[in-house]
Design a protein with these regions (language model features):
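N-terminal pre-domain/capping segments
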Residues: 1-93, 187, 294-340, 345, ...
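Hydrophobic faces of well-ordered beta-strands that scaffold small-molecule active sites
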Residues: 3-9, 34-36, 64-68, 103-105, ...
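Active-site beta-loop-alpha junctions enriched in small/polar residues
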Residues: 8-12, 37-41, 69-71, 108-110, ...
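Gly/Pro-rich active-site loop or hairpin
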Residues: 16, 114-117, 170-173, 196-267
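Acidic (Asp/Glu)-rich catalytic clusters
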Residues: 23-28, 45-65, 93-97, 132-135, ...
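Active-site acidic/histidine proton-transfer and metal-coordination neighborhood
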Residues: 59, 74-189
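Flexible, acidic glycine-rich loops studded with aromatic residues
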Residues: 264-268, 273-278, 293, 302-305
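C-terminal helical cap(s) of enzyme catalytic domains, especially alpha/beta-barrels
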Residues: 278-291
Length: 399
């Protein structure tokens, strides 16, 4: 099993914004791949840093990948298709310069065509031309081998056909698999967030992921997978936007469990499309490690059970049944040892609550009585002195 993880673009934590600086940060995090984004355009000034990144990837055995333009119209009219192919040509040249192993592309809207065989044949025809073009670029000129040493082995980048996230876009899982099955040199790019959204939240358990990868393996007979993963907000079978993994109903834990428990045959590159990029890539690494630890703990328990069963001359299944019985007995004993608090009758409770109320009423009555006690009768001398300063209310009218 081989699983390489990395972000889609330069890490957010990278102080510099060049690809080489991003690669340094990714390698320092222990990640093994990245996907360079050329989603809108490839400018000539970019090729210098692309070449530097390609040299670093070649020396460090680091897997580089590239994402072509998002807005392709491969099913549009001839003008739209030629514009899209011009952008794809720039992405292919960048892939050669950067030593990319995969080039991810979209087909775009259906245009005037509808879903079905005709649209799939049109897409397949275009991708056959793209595959031939990447081969020509890779084997263009032997004189440039000293500058691009990774071209010597003669293995061009794979052309990836990505699953789309919306119903109006070509790229359902079945459409992608049909095209890839008929075009040599292409691979399916399983955008798991898109597949989850188009399936109305279909990827929820490790069994769901198992069915997905088995479907791909049985259809095109591959063990190599190139996947994107991210959280996603979706409605009515359409992906709205990417989210961080923890804020989505698309959980990574079931995929990690599938990779460890049943994915020993996988050769997978897994790209984090999350807005958190390398942070969620590290989150995926941690979940895979946790799944691996759980597997080791389970195997250790099974080995111990087999050893005890052999000593007791019984089967491991019988030993497991005994362990369950012992655990249940211990749970019952623990419940029995817990002394429940005595339950008092309602009348006693009412009596207890009434007594404090009576005490409070008695205290209130005492305070009222004390307030009502007449003050000490003043002496005649004190009354006369008080009269000296007594002022009737009517005197205020004088002023």
């Amino acid at each position: 099993m081989s699983v390489k993880l990395g972000p889609a673009g330069v890490p957010l934590s990278c102080k510099g914004r060049t690809i080489v600086e991003g690669m340094d940060d990714i390698i320092s995090l222990g990640l093994e791949t990245m996907e360079v984004q050329t989603v809108r355009m490839v400018a000539p000034q970019h090729f210098e840093q692309y070449w530097q990144a390609g040299v670093l990837a070649y020396k460090a055995d680091f897997e580089m990948n590239i994402h072509g333009p998002y807005y392709s119209e491969l099913l549009g009219d001839r003008l739209q298709r030629n514009r899209s192919l011009a952008k794809i040509e720039a992405a292919l040249q960048a892939a050669k310069t950067i030593n990319a192993r995969h080039v991810t592309l979209h087909a775009g809207h259906y245009g005037d065509m509808s879903r079905g065989q005709a649209a799939n044949e049109q897409v397949a025809s275009v991708f056959k031309g793209i595959v031939q073009r990447i081969r020509d670029i890779w084997n263009d000129d032997e004189e440039i081998y000293p500058v691009f040493p990774w071209l010597k082995d003669g293995t061009p980048a794979k052309i990836g056909v990505e699953t789309s996230g919306r119903q109006e876009l070509w790229g359902s899982l079945e459409e992608v698999l049909e095209v890839v099955n008929h075009v040599e040199g292409t691979i399916p790019v399983l955008n798991l967030a898109h597949i989850h959204a188009r399936g109305h939240g279909r990827l929820r358990t490790s069994e769901d992921y198992g069915e997905l990868f088995d479907q791909v393996r049985e259809t095109i007979g591959t063990k190599q997978f190139y996947c994107h993963f991210s959280g996603v907000e979706h409605r009515m079978g359409n992906a709205m936007h990417y989210t961080q993994i923890k804020k989505s109903d698309l959980n990574f834990e079931p995929l990690a469990e599938f990779i460890i428990e049943e994915g020993s045959w996988l050769d997978m590159t897994l790209i984090s499309d999350s807005p958190l990029l390398e942070h969620d890539a590290m989150y995926m690494v941690q979940n895979i490690e946790r799944a691996r630890h759980r597997q080791l703990e389970r195997k250790a328990r099974e080995d111990r059970r087999k050893a005890l069963a052999a000593q007791a001359n019984i089967t491991p299944e019988e030993m497991e049944a005994r362990e369950i019985q012992v655990a249940e007995a211990r749970a019952k004993d623990a419940l029995a040892n817990v002394q429940p608090a005595p339950v008092e009758s309602e009348e006693a409770v009412e009596g207890e609550t009434a007594e404090p109320e009576k005490k409070e009423e008695a205290v209130e009555e005492k305070t009222v009585e004390s307030d009502k006690k007449p003050a000490k009768k003043a002496t005649k001398k004190e009354e006369d002195n008080d009269d000296l300063f007594a002022v009737e209310e009517d005197d205020d009218d004088i002023f």
